[in-house]
Swiss-Prot record:
This is Chorismate synthase 2. Reduced FMN (FMNH(2)). The gene is aroC2. It comes from Bacillus thuringiensis subsp. konkukian (strain 97-27). PANTHER family: CHORISMATE SYNTHASE. This reaction introduces a second double bond into the aromatic ring system.
Amino acid sequence: MRYITAGESHGPQLTVILEGVPAGLTLAAEHINKELLRRQKGHGRGRRMQIETDTVEIVSGVRHGMTLGSPITLIVKNDDFKHWTKVMGAEPISEKESKEMKRTITKPRPGHADLNGAIKYGHRDIRNVLERSSARETTVRVAAGAVAKQILKELGVEIAGHVLEIGGVKAKHISNLSIEEIQIITENSPVRCLDKTVEQEMMDAIDNAKSSGDSIGGIVEVIAEGMPIGVGSYVHYDRKLDAKLAGAIMSINAFKGAEIGVGFEAARQPGSKVHDEILWDEEQGYTRKTNNAGGLEGGMTTGMPIVVRGVMKPIPTLYKPLASVDIDTKEAFQASIERSDSCAVPAAGVVAESVVAWELAHALVEQFGKDRMELIQQNITQHNKYAKEF
């Protein structure tokens, strides 16, 4: 499976085309809209989320609530486009009109794609860069992830995400929660945190950053349960599932780090305390005493829960802008200011769920049959029986 997205932040719409989704998957707009709404929530979100209503239109690949096996096209309209029709129009405009309506940007923002992208593509107007590099594009990545979550659900895999840290405020580790319990708790938290004792402190940190014109980042975690043993591969570097998951996390806007299981903590512990001892019983088959590997060894699933974390840096658009240089005059200026969030970590957690869900669904479809859901389900059932008796 693969997908490609298109569209600009203030353009008419965002589009994603999904290829390789098996036939026979139950899919309706409500499944996708639920995830889009989750992305819009979270303490620290900016005014843009008050403008957009983010609902999906399914325009191909689905008939009467069932996928056909052909490419699926999903569209999300940008409600804010009505205020940008001249600025973001596709048709040519005169030089006079250009000066009046283009809202040209020549002062790149540190931390964004602005300067590097302008140099790469030769854009003298940085708006041509920021419109596409904006995290608004993650709207349709979440839509794609919603489809992946439907695949996982029908294949017996559950997934949830939560926030571990915001602006230096850390949540306590809470273990032994089911995926459903994590989902319920986080959906009722304005910062998607499992630890209610630090929830207000996280919100205060966000509010303080906003009032000072600053921004803060954080850490999110995604957990998936129900993956069969042996999904992925040790044979080739580009088929290792942990590599794909780390790459997916790093592809999210403003994410600067990824870890699986205990992650970087493994460097501080001896091997005897890091590696997960193997157990077997007649009821469960092969299991592990611990899950420090985060459900992945040698590029393949172990059958234990997948645990992936991502680090999000503070959003680079600041209301007290940093020093920059005008690319036209080369004079020192403060960077341009665009409408932005003070903290998008809770929303980014939803995006992280989506990209992890896509990689897991892709791996299952690739390994157990590509064409139809019924066949994939049968193959996974047979594989699980085989692995248990191995």
